[in-house]
Each structure stands twice: as structure tokens, then as C-alpha cells.
Amino acid sequence: MEMKARGLRIPLLLLLVTVVVMAKVNHIQRWGGFKEKAMSKKNINSTLHFFIRSYNNASNDTYLYQVQKLIQGQMQLTTGVEYLVTVKIGRTKCKKNETKKASCPLQSSKLKKSLICKSLIYSVPWMNYYQLWNNSCQES
């Protein structure tokens, strides 16, 4: 019987270490929760630029969209920074297949379309790394 108990020591120790490590990781990842903080202009601009580029790449629309307004911005520190943003975006007059123009005016005719999007973006700003984790848009 003692031999069986010795044989279980290492697996049980490994299980204990795994549980402790996972508890620490989960604690770190949820450190503080989302907060409405004044985000640096540079970080929010690069995050919104990443968002709209991702949205345009995934969209089946012929026209490009641009961010019209940041409605709400929250951030949470994890292993990087998670941004929970709500933005209003609008369809522009620039087509996707055209050479990118410095300025794309918004549609003003029957093609006018605005969306409210709520997105979760993971970022490691000091490494210029962004990933769109979740996005949901509805017509406004």
C-alpha cells in the first residue's frame, strides 16, 4: 500500500502545481477589470486604426468605413491591454479597391450608412501587436 502512495506523489504534486499556476494566471488576467480611464491618445488612435482596418478587411461592403466617433472606451490590464470600445462608424465614398486616399468623405446620399460597433481588442502596445477578439455592429 505504501508503494502505491509513493507512486501517486509525483502526479499529485504536478496536479497541485498546475492548479496553483492556473489560479495565479486567472488572477493576473482579470486584474482590476475594465475601467473607464483616460487612455493615451496614441494608444487609442492606434487601437481604433487597427479596428477599422480589421472591420474593412472582413466587411463585404464595396466601400470603406471610417470611425466617426468614440462613444465609450474602457481598458483592462492583463498580460497586455484589453480595450472594450464602442464606436460609431460610417460608410465613406472611397471604394475598397481604389488606391487609398488621404481623406475619404462620408456618404451623404442613399448609400449613407452608420453602424454602432462594440469591440474587444487585445493589444500589446509596446510591441505594436493587436488582435480583434470580438466585434458586434448594428445599424444606428
Curated annotation (Swiss-Prot):
GO MF terms, alphabetically ordered: cysteine-type endopeptidase inhibitor activity; cysteine-type peptidase activity
**Known Pfam families for this protein?**
Cystatin
All copies of domain Cystatin, residue ranges: 32-126
Localized where? Secreted
Q: What is its main location?
A: secreted
Among SUPFAM superfamilies, the record links this protein to: Cystatin/monellin
One Gene Ontology biological process: signaling receptor ligand precursor processing
Entries under InterPro entries matching the protein: CSTL1, Cystatin_dom, Cystatin_sf
Identify the GO cellular component terms for this protein: extracellular region
Q: Show which residues constitute the signal peptide.
A: 1-23
Top-level taxon of origin? Eukaryota
Instruction: Print the keywords alphabetically.
Output: Disulfide bond, Glycoprotein, Protease inhibitor, Secreted, Signal, Thiol protease inhibitor
The SS bond pairs are: C94-C104, C117-C137
As for family, the record states: Belongs to the cystatin family.
Which protein, by its recorded name, is this? Cystatin-like 1
Species whose genome carries this gene = Mus musculus (Mouse)
Instruction: Point out the gene that encodes the protein.
Output: Cstl1
